[in-house]
Structure formats: C-alpha cells, structure tokens
C-alpha cells in the first residue's frame, strides 16, 4: 500500500534508474526510494539506453513530468477532466519549454466515446463511422497513436476471444484506410 502522494517522485526516480540500467555496465544508484549497488543488467536493450518510456496523465504535475522525462504521452481523460482539446495547448507549451518538438512528440489516446451511457457506448463500438470520425479527430489533434480499450467491448457482450477478435478486425478494417500513411 503505497502513498499516492509520492508516486510521481517514485516514477521519476524509477525512470532515472531504468535508464542507467540500460546504459551502464554496472549501476550504483542511491535515490530516495531506490538504492542499488554494483548491479548489472544483461542483455542490454538493442536501442542502447533508448527504450521509449511513455507516461500517462493530464493533470498539471503529470504533464510537466511527461514533458520533462517522458518519450511519449499516453493521454487520458476521466469524468470531470477538461476535454483533451483544452489540455493539448498547455502540454505543447511544456514540451517546448523542455526542448521537445510538439509536432514530432509521440502521443497516444484511446479510441473511446468517453464517459457516456452503456447504449451510446455500444453504438460507438458498433458504428464504424463514429469510430473512424473519433480516430480522425485524434489524428487531426496531433495524436500519433491510438488504442482500443477492450474492457468496454467485453462488457458490451464481446465475451469470447473469437467475438472480441472479430470485432477488433472490423474496427481495424474500418480504420486502416483512413489512418494509414
């Protein structure tokens, strides 16, 4: 049971430790939360210290952290959060403040109808035009990647792996022509 008030600092320290593991032969690290002495990790990643770390969040502290130490942003919104269109300008400013190009910074957001009732959610995941429109909206906002949360699909009746894969294939077939380069 960790204190949620320290999770951001723990994440930052953990990212620093991981990057050191991926780069150095032997790691000595003495942080507030993590300490290691003469630890080695093998094999090293082929990217040599450059495994991209994507971080999620939309609150101000999270956005600052992502812009400072992240390699990609997994955007998300919860009920009561401002729409992503309102968060994006601030995030792009933070990227620039940290010497990162907002036009090329990787950003991902789930293809989701948001917090709406079950009937509208079911329509969303069955209406390929709605899905394509949402994906195009995210692309036009600058998102480089999207994902699909399979939990709502499961909750909407796509219970077997075959049914879920069939629905995901339909979604892919609808999205691919619109979003491929």
Q: Language-model features: where?
A:
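Active-site-adjacent structural elements that line small-molecule/cofactor binding pockets in enzymes
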Residues: 1-181
């Amino acid at each position: 049971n960790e204190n949620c008030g320290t999770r951001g600092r723990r994440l930052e320290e953990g990212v620093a430790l991981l990057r050191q593991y991926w780069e150095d032969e032997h790691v000595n690290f003495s942080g507030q939360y993590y300490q290691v002495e003469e630890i080695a990790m093998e094999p090293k990643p082929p990217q040599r210290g450059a495994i991209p770390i994507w971080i999620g969040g939309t609150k101000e502290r999270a956005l600052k952290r992502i812009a400072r130490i992240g390699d990609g942003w997994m955007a998300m919104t919860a009920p009561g959060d401002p729409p992503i269109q309102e968060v994006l300008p601030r995030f792009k400013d933070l990227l620039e403040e940290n010497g990162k190009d907002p036009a090329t910074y990787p950003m991902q957001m789930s293809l989701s109808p948001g917090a709406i009732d079950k009937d509208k959610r079911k329509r969303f995941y069955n209406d390929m035009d709605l899905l394509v429109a949402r994906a195009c909206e995210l692309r036009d906002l600058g998102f480089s990647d999207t994902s699909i949360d399979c939990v709502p699909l499961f909750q909407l009746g796509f219970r077997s792996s075959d049914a879920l894969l069939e629905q995901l294939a339909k979604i892919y077939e609808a999205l691919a022509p619109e979003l491929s380069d």
